[in-house]
């Protein structure tokens, strides 16, 4: 299943990794472009999950259209106070 995970915080990153290990094609969306680039470069969410590798098969992007286009499921893992910005 093609899944978009909106929100690259602790919960969003954890869900993306678990969904990937359960055989799904996952795209992880991060609001801040600079942090998305850091996640791509390091493949570790140093702010929320230091030491936990993000598998290279998980696509990381800050482009919400790229993240949600042609997906079977969209997971919303954004804190409620930031929902308006999504």
Label the predicted regions:
Residues 1-52, 59-62:
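NAD(P)+-binding Rossmann beta1-loop-alpha1 motif at the extreme N-terminus of oxidoreductases
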């Amino acid at each position: 299943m093609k899944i978009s995970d909106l929100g690259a915080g602790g919960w969003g990153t954890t869900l993306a990794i678990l969904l990937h290990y359960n055989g799904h094609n996952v795209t992880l969306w991060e609001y801040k472009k600079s942090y998305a680039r850091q996640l791509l470069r390091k493949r570790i969410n140093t702010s929320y999950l230091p030491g936990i590798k993000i598998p290279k098969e998980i696509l990381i992007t800050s482009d919400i259209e790229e993240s949600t286009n042609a997906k079977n499921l969209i997971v919303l893992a954004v804190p409620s106070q930031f929902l308006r910005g999504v």
